[in-house]
Amino acid sequence: MPHNKSFQTHKSFKDLIDKYEGFILDQFGVLHNGVCGLEGAPELVKELRDTYQKKLVILSNTSSSSASCKAKLPSLGFDPKYFENAVTSGQEAGNHIHETFAPSRKKALWFTWKTKDILSPLRFLELCGEEVPLTTDPSE
């Protein structure tokens, strides 16, 4: 079987530090498990910033906003100041809806699951650039 040189295995993250100016780090399963930082992750993040001055960005498929994602970091053992930004699917969806549909003034219906971390539907639609009428009249 031919050797695929596009993939390399490294014994330590430190093998990669000098090769890149920054890192995009997936949130769940790489940085934390939803309850606390994974073993060594908070220390590595601190070292990447303080010792090596690397730029760090969080990537997450959460439906929450980037701000909400960063606000949870302290409870997971991370200092938010170490991250340039957080890119979340929720934030990107809101941006896309705003850019694509807000000018048309079309109505929207949002389906999601209930969780303490999710934005309220009204707040999410406001982030999408929608004026939110406070009515549930189905005739509208």
Positions of PLM-derived features:
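HAD-like aspartate-dependent phosphatase fold
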Residues: 1-140
